[in-house]
Amino acid sequence: MNNPWLVISIGAILLFIMLILYFRKSDKNKIKAALTVGILLTVFDFILENIGKITGFWESFHGLIYIAYVPIEIFIICFFGGVMWSLILPSKRDDKFSVLFILLSIISATFLESKLVDIGLFGYGNGWTTFHALVAYSIIIFLMHETFYFSYAKFSKDKFNWLSPP
């Protein structure tokens, strides 16, 4: 496999399968909320990736297939990564866990992106730096966290099943 994006995507899918198998008999509302976060992250990232490319702030390189300016592998990573990230959250809010988990996630995401820059899969321009990425990840990860708990509360309270037709 010559494409690192593909390797990362396959890894994300395999981890996703393992977590879904682990959680399949537990709280279905947690899985629905996690899927919501995965979809949100994928859409949000698609918009941001395109804005970044158009403005010259950042760009992804060496994708197999591009949708607008975004490699298909990034869609896969965002969706499955967002779901996996959400499944780690406890069903009931735990502020201490959340603060530590959010901080660890921000640091990890920023570090991993800096490594993507180092190996040539991602690039910055027009003054964008790793610090800017840190701030962006802080906002995105906080939104993912809040989306998970908002969605979980909605699915638990209303018994709304968005996976089934009305």
Where are these regions (language model features)?
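Aromatic-rich, lipid-facing transmembrane alpha helices and their immediate juxtamembrane interface loops
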Residues: 1-166
